[in-house]
Amino acid sequence: MRIVTTRRISQVFFFLLFVWFCIVATVGSKFWQLRGWPIEWFFQLDPLVAVGTVLTTHTLYWPLLWALATVVLTLIFGRFFCSWVCPFGSLHHFVGFLGRRSKKLAHKVKLNRYRKAQRVKYYVLVAFLALTAFPSAAATLQVGILDPIAVITRSFNLVLLPIVDSPTSFIFISRRFYEGGWLILVIFLAAVLLNLAIPRFYCRFICPLGALFGIIDRFAIWRIGKKQRECVNCILCERDCEGGCEPAGNIRISECVLCFNCLDSCKHSVIAYQTKTSAAGEVTNPDISRRGFALSLVSGLFGVGAIRLSNRLGSNWYYKVVRPPGSLPEEEFLKRCVKCGQCMRVCPTNVIQPAGFEGGLENLWTPVLNNRIGSSGCQLNCVACGQVCTTSAIRPITLAEKLGVNEFAEAGPIKMGTAFVDRSRCLPWAMDKPCIVCEENCPLSPKAIFTREEFVTLRDGVFTAKKIGGDTIEILEGSLKPAKFAGGDYYCAVDGSARWKITANTETSLTVSADERFRKLAAEISKIEVQVRLQRPYVDIERCIGCGICEHECPVSGKKAIRVSAEGETRSADRKLLLER
């Protein structure tokens, strides 16, 4: 079997495996739904994620030790990951092939020549690593913005799968929505479609993981090269070169992605995969200048300060950034989150959303709770998000820890935030309309939302009694809307104290649930008041955990009348609402 055929089989296998892992990241009872599938495996193989988290946290989440195997294999075989394993690289490879397949040899060679701009990816890598390492107290993990595994995972989970599945609902029970999905889609399409202009555009010019492999690759034992200097210069080896490494001359080892197209194309067996250096010479070091390195390093160092200028980790923290249950304290969270979207994908209620720029640049695409989207708020019996987090930015917690029961009873439940009633928009508070939706839907026991009963006289609710017969009161002002007061929350009051529930009404009369007292007072009644019984909601901040179900169910559209913010979250000691005694 030809080596390129083997490589294509590997690419198809790992790409389909990646898609399968995206599909099975679904909570459910079917055999393919989150049943021990290693859906974080591609991230665990990613040395850039491992290096980034080590630099920011000075610890290594043990599943990321898989990345060490990737590094060792790269030191032995070269940049195998880019052309044999990486699903994003395989996608670029395929689209690039479609873009150049009908072109002539000279044009293909021109497309695949090395360009000095390919050094940009090394500068991107240096800038990202500078963000993670200097200074350690302010370090932030931003490699997930451009890391290829993070980019393709985020794009598939938050954009492509929801779009493809929307007509059939095979994967998702209900249609999925993600805020800012358009930006993720635009970046993904731009990265993929640029391959039509230059093959593997993203891999050559942008990919920081490819840059890291390029640095490691210069020490590889096995490498592509010429067995002899003499060559007929047919340049067939550069026709389909995926990395632009110029195998016909002094091959650029750091740019070779080990696609083996050159070896397969060489009709004279001059190109070989060997342990000795190329007979025609090699360029082993990445093509970067000291000035460019220094500039990217300084950019990364200044970037740390620039993204923290708004003091979002201090007193100016953004109250709408409500993290999923089990999230680490904000500073530590931002040192670990790679913005992959796995937690958003697995959330059964679709409440976990990618953050925008409102919480600061480093908050972009990190998980936040948006209780207006999806089918509900954060369900009490769900801890799926922490089980799929690659770097443990969201800790894997148990239901007992989330609910604060059994061995966690003393610590209490995990609070994601606190619900606040906006009395200027709440129906019972602002508009004298009966509503207890938030209290009814609070899932806690005892409930964190309770009500206090009040009777309020309606505007224009004072009427003159014209005639009283049995349980019916005819009024002098005949202007009532039929059945308006028949819902069970309206009462007929006399002297502000005696009340009888209104059971029906016409334009000119009210029917009440009369009792003996009503019949005794009937002859004396001249003025009546129509009152509404209001159950005005209050939040017990010591019980509320910020699940957001009340906010999701609130009937006030637009800006909800009860909203959850991050005050009181248990992960941050400086965001407590009450002093502990």
Regions found by a protein language model. Name each.
Residues M1-R581:
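Non-ligating segments of multi-cofactor redox enzymes
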